[in-house]
């Protein structure tokens, strides 16, 4: 594409065979389109179309260029060009008719695309190009069973070869080249395949069939994830593991049901025997000094997370429980819908999910003196996400609103807003490098970050803003896939004062009446400040056999007072692997608690 752009813009004369200004301008426009500079190509083609409004090749090239632009006005102009073309392209010109079908599809006029595909199938039922376009159109509309019928018919024709390749009569004796729907129309005026069968074409069709067949493969996944976060022993430290086992059962080609059974073991360590840290845990600060422990000092929990749900192209739902066997067990789940509105993609979600940052927030805990249980926090709310592409950039905006509740924990509210922009800065046959920026803003109604009775043990500043710069490299070589993602960030947060016991005026008054060794009061002081953070996520996956894949993932997060480390090893077994294409990045097993 760089060479095409250079040729289109340099002053070097074009070949003498392009004898007229029209031919030269058209050739330059095609070079610009080959370089993906569609706006410049459209600007060059518009005067040609105005000067020669009946020139079919110019109008087709202009429609092709406009259909690849994201501006709504350009899409409308492309639709106007397509409306003009549909009555003027000869019915027997299969190449141009298929080019028009791709334009309809690109600008979102799916009714016109389907109607044209139906007419072409009626007129050319033995043309593999027509069958392939119809198959891809059905696949785009998620009609996978019908797409398979067309793909298999095209494969049969290509495997035995064509007796007479279709041809198209084009202006200016334009050469015919193979169709590639991802390339500009100017470079693909026909899709004539060789006779006998072309192995590359047969392999491509077979790959598309295999990709659809992969949608209905049963599989099972299992993993072991080690958790580690060093902080105050017995209170905010967290060590342990989660062992997810997930069975995936296909629902035709449309999606998969799944069943999660995840064993979980968490350990915060031993509570301090005395001292200021102990006063900030449970009800200790409200009870007489020296009160004996009613529970063991070791703070830990074992349980099982269970979930059942469905993941399809545009619908996802699940229902389950977290922490069967923990001090607090919660019903969790979610429902989400994705789709497109013009050039925008959206996701709407309602959810109820666990907060897993500490033993207290995830499993709940028992007060060491009274034995009362508190914690086990869940976020119940709704979220929305809107995304689109702007030239080479992808951008998204998301908003999440939730109420946070737990057993004997004060109710809280949370608002999270995030904007992100990224683009691929390097592409190669083996992988891609993506660079971006993300701005996040959070607001909590209360700061319940502490571990005394009524707090939730989860980070909840009143206000938080951060700017992050993520860099990601992912790819595949042979049976090996990889992902490396690093990010640096700066943030600013602030919190107000918070009582030790926001849920209980009685406990708060008892704590105020108890003499404090340092003369202080049972109130957590407010604070504000800035910080610097960095994170890393790396994953490797290897396809050992067509049935079995093994992988590992490491996640690190580092900031002033937060430094968790997670490491996972996992495996995936496909019962009917066939020849499904490999993913271009690892797909680690997801624990149910992280949905």
Segments from the language model and where they lie:
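Gram-negative and organellar
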Residues: 1-595
């Amino acid at each position: 594409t760089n060479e095409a752009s250079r040729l289109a813009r340099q002053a070097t004369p074009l070949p003498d065979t392009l004898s007229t200004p029209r031919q030269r301008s058209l050739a330059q426009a095609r070079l610009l389109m080959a370089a993906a500079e569609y706006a410049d190509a459209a600007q060059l083609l518009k005067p040609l179309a105005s000067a020669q409004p009946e020139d079919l090749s110019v109008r087709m090239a202009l429609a092709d260029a406009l259909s690849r632009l994201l501006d709504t006005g350009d899409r409308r102009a492309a639709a106007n060009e397509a409306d003009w073309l549909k009555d003027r392209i000869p019915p027997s010109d299969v190449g141009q008719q298929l080019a028009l079908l791709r334009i309809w599809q690109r600008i979102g006029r799916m009714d016109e695309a389907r109607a044209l595909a139906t007419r072409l199938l009626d007129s050319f039922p033995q043309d593999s190009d027509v069958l392939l376009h119809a198959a891809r159109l059905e696949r785009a509309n998620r009609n996978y069973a019908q797409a398979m019928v067309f793909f298999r018919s095209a494969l049969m024709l290509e495997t035995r070869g064509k007796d007479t390749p279709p041809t198209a009569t084009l202006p200016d004796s334009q050469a015919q080249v193979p169709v590639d729907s991802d390339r500009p129309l100017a470079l693909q005026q026909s899709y004539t395949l060789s006779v006998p069968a072309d192995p590359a074409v047969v392999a491509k069709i077979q790959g598309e069939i295999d990709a659809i067949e992969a949608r209905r493969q049963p599989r099972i996944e299992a993993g072991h994830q080690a958790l580690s976060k060093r902080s105050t022993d017995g209170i905010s430290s967290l060590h342990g593991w989660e062992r997810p086992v997930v069975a995936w059962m296909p629902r035709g080609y449309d999606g998969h049901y799944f069943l999660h059974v995840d064993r979980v073991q968490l350990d915060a360590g031993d509570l301090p025997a005395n001292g200021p840290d102990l006063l900030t845990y449970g009800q200790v600060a409200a009870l007489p000094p020296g009160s004996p422990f009613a529970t063991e000092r070791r703070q830990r929990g074992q349980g099982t997370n269970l979930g059942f749900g469905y993941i399809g192209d545009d619908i996802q739902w699940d229902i389950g429980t977290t922490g069967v066997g923990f001090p607090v067990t919660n019903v969790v789940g979610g429902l989400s819908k994705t789709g497109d509105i013009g050039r925008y993609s959206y996701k709407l979600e309602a959810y109820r999910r666990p907060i897993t940052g500490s033993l207290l927030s995830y499993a709940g805990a028992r007060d060491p003196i009274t034995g009362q249980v508190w914690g086990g926090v869940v976020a119940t709310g709704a979220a929305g996400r809107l995304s689109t592409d702007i030239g080479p950039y992808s951008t998204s905006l998301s908003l999440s609103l939730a109420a946070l509740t737990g057993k004997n924990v004060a109710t809280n509210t949370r608002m999270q807003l995030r904007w992100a922009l990224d683009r691929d800065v390097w592409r190669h046959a083996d992988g891609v490098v993506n660079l971006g920026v993300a701005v996040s803003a959070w607001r909590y109604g209360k700061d319940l970050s502490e571990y005394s009775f009524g707090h939730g043990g989860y980070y909840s500043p009143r206000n938080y803003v951060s700017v992050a710069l993520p860099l990601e490299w992912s790819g595949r070589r042979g049976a090996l896939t990889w992902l490396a993602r690093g990010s640096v960030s700066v943030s600013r947060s602030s919190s107000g004062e918070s009582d030790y016991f926001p849920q209980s005026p009685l406990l708060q008054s008892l704590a105020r009446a108890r003499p404090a060794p340092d003369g202080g009061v049972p109130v957590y002081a407010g604070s504000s400040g800035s910080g610097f953070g960095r994170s890393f996520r790396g994953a490797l996956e290897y396809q050992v056999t067509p049935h079995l894949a093994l992988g590992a993932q490491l996640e690190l997060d580092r900031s002033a007072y937060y430094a968790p480390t997670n490491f996972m090893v996992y495996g995936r077994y496909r019962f009917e692997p066939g020849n499904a294409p490999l993913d271009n990045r690892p797909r680690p097993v997801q624990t149910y608690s992280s949905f």
